[in-house]
Amino acid sequence: MDDRKFTLNFGPQHPAAHGVLRMILDLDGEIVTRVDSHIGLLHRGTEKLLEYKTYLQGMPYFDRLDYCAPMNQEHAWCLAIEKLLGVEVPRRASIIRVMYSEIGRIMSHLLNVGTGVMDVGALTPITWCFEEREKLCVFYERASGSRMHAAYFRPGGVHQDLPQRLIDDIATWCDQFPGKLDQIEGLVTENRIFKQRNVDIGVVDQRTILDWGFSGVMVRGSGLAWDLRRSQPYECYSELDFKVPVGRHGDNYDRYVCRMDEMRESVKIILQCIDLMAKDGPGPVLLAGSKLSPPRRADMKNSMEALIHHFKLYTEGFHVPEGECYAAVEAPKGEFGVYLVADGTNRPYRAKIRAPGYPHLQAMDYLCKGHQLADVSAVLGTLDIVFGEIDR
């Protein structure tokens, strides 16, 4: 019997597990020879629950998938419904959606960078990341009433318009945020210990990306400039000017650098959205005069038909024509997609959710084999997985 070979249980309560992940690691001394990921500990049957809810009632379930950036998931659900209905959202609503999707991207990347750096021993950056993330949570709350589970997007637009004061505060935050990123990068990016722990660790080449079905930063970190916002533009992304940051080596370090650069690009997109809203002026944020949107409060006080419409919208919901479609968004963690099958009723026949973290976690065995035990948490951190969406 070789006493150098043994099996180790990692998680599901481990602080570096980023949720309820259990991994069974086979080790040869300090070297990892096999990783067996056990998932399902956060399974809530979301896809089945959606079949029993109206399209509007299904919306809050998407906030609870990737709860690090909730509105990005709502976006995919709305796009799928709108695709089947054949409707186009008002321009101002489209701009607000893009702006809050980018706020969600920064929220997710701040959390990932802060915890990922902490996993390899740096304790200061996470406090700076959370300080900035807290301000973004306040912007979520001021738009929707909730810091986390917003349920702000709607099929046909967004729930309500943003007050001008909130837009001004977002612009002010965007002006100071790049300085905070410089502060984090000054401590981390060229740090000798951080580079030793991440350079040439968890390398993926372009062939592996295609084989495993990776998306998001996992693709761009290896040099492929694949971003749905650029390659398959939705909403008003085709009008916006932004770069797609890419890495060269496909290792942990390149993925960290890509996320830092993406936050800078997201700030540029948010500022462009604010300029577009200022140029276009006030406008509707929800499809007016359709079965998708509730009537105005003033109309409900004077019209019995408006009151009935309001009641039926929130009890029975609206009917979606029979058909099927796939709608995807470039979420912070990769391509988040919804394959929606409608049977002509007020509830979906089937909704299949494509979680970007699922194929990434499958590759843990490939990524960690031959590395040391201490590198497992570093690799896991740069995958940026969240179990709300993986277990569903």
Swiss-Prot record:
A cellular component term, taken from the record's GO annotations: plasma membrane
Main location (coarse class): membrane
Organism domain of life: Bacteria
PROSITE patterns given in the database record: COMPLEX1_49K
EC assignment: 7.1.1.-
EC class (word): translocase
Protein topology in the membrane: Peripheral membrane protein
Localization per record: Cell inner membrane
SUPFAM superfamilies in alphabetical order: HydB/Nqo4-like
Keywords: Cell inner membrane, Cell membrane, Membrane, NAD, Quinone, Translocase, Transport, Ubiquinone
Reactions catalysed according to its record: a quinone + NADH + 5 H(+)(in) = a quinol + NAD(+) + 4 H(+)(out)
Pfam families recorded: Complex1_49kDa
GO molecular function, one term: NADH:ubiquinone reductase (non-electrogenic) activity
UniProt xrefs under Gene3D superfamilies: Cytochrome-c3 Hydrogenase, chain B (1.10.645.10)
Record's function text: NDH-1 shuttles electrons from NADH, via FMN and iron-sulfur (Fe-S) centers, to quinones in the respiratory chain. The immediate electron acceptor for the enzyme in this species is believed to be ubiquinone. Couples the redox reaction to proton translocation (for every two electrons transferred, four hydrogen ions are translocated across the cytoplasmic membrane), and thus conserves the redox energy in a proton gradient.
Subunit record text: NDH-1 is composed of 14 different subunits. Subunits NuoB, C, D, E, F, and G constitute the peripheral sector of the complex.
Family as reported in the entry's similarity comment: Belongs to the complex I 49 kDa subunit family.
Designated name of the protein: NADH-quinone oxidoreductase subunit D
Gene designation per UniProt: nuoD
